[in-house]
Swiss-Prot record:
Residues passing through the membrane, by range: 166-186
Region spans: Disordered: 204-233
UniProt similarity note: Belongs to the Smp family.
NCBIfam families: PRK11246.1
Membrane topology listed for this record: Single-pass membrane protein
Signal peptide: 1-33
GO cellular component: plasma membrane
Main location: membrane
Residue spans of biased composition, Acidic residues class: 208-217
Gene label: smp
InterPro entries assigned: Uncharacterised_Smp
Taxonomic classification: Bacteria, Pseudomonadati, Pseudomonadota, Gammaproteobacteria, Enterobacterales
Full protein name: Protein Smp
Organism of derivation: Yersinia pestis
């Protein structure tokens, strides 16, 4: 009896541990889902920024293809100012094919500091550099460089955390509903699985569904014989 009781406890403990492990995996899966969604969104933003750089380079192509002495730097500066005004683009610069700076707009930060080549700007890993060639009639006429701010704002980070917490809460609510339904539907009932040799109730017979004794064949036959008996005089 003691050995069977010990086996039953070990069996129940193993089931509980497996359920807890699955619950932890579901929680981590919710975090992974939110993180993958955030990474996919970052890739989408990078693709959109690359498309924007190509469009700006296409707009600068007629200006840059007019020759080194005839480049209208004011038009280039106006385009860059419009590009960097109240946006995630921190700065933008246009260079000639030999590296000469034509115009720049945005934050007044040196390229070496922006790229953290000297290690003086620890927050530069939140910046993403985009370089796009400006095509001309006879070949490249210059280059466009943009600095994209990839830092996640506090509101965006909080939104991701709220999504993760909501998924975890839904998992816990589903678990609680399952436990309540199981206890409500199985409370006071014993089924065939309780005849398992690992349970202490293995030797106790299982009662069948509640049936009225009047519905048994013997009761029906007895009732029929009673109905056919002659009445006592």
């Amino acid at each position: 009896m003691a050995r069977a009781k010990l086996k039953f406890r070990l069996h129940r403990t193993a089931i509980v541990l497996i359920c807890l492990a699955l619950l932890v995996l579901l929680m981590q899966g919710a975090s992974y889902f939110s993180l993958s969604h955030q990474l996919a969104r970052s890739e989408q933003v990078e693709e959109l920024a690359q498309t924007l750089a190509k469009q700006v380079a296409f707009s600068l192509s007629p200006i840059m293809d007019s020759g080194d002495d005839n480049i209208d730097s004011q038009k280039v500066d106006a385009i860059l100012q419009q590009l960097t005004q109240s946006s995630r683009i921190l700065d933008a610069s246009v260079y000639q094919i030999d590296g000469t700076l034509v115009a720049s707009a945005g934050e007044n930060v040196k390229v070496r500091d922006r790229l953290a080549l000297d290690g003086k700007r620890p927050g530069s890993y939140f910046n993403h550099q985009i370089v796009e060639m400006i095509a001309g009639n006879s070949g490249p006429s210059g280059f466009l460089r943009m600095t994209l701010d990839t830092h996640v704002l506090a509101t965006e980070s909080k939104q991701v955390d709220n999504t993760t917490n909501l998924l975890r809460l839904m998992i816990l609510v589903a678990l609680a509903v399952g436990i309540i339904l199981a206890r409500t539907l199985l409370q006071g009932r014993r089924s065939r699985w309780q005849q398992s040799p690992y349970l202490l109730t293995a030797n106790i017979p299982v009662k069948e569904e509640d049936e009225s004794e009047d519905d048994t064949p013997e009761a029906l036959v007895g009732q029929a014989e009673t109905d056919h008996k002659p009445a006592d005089k």
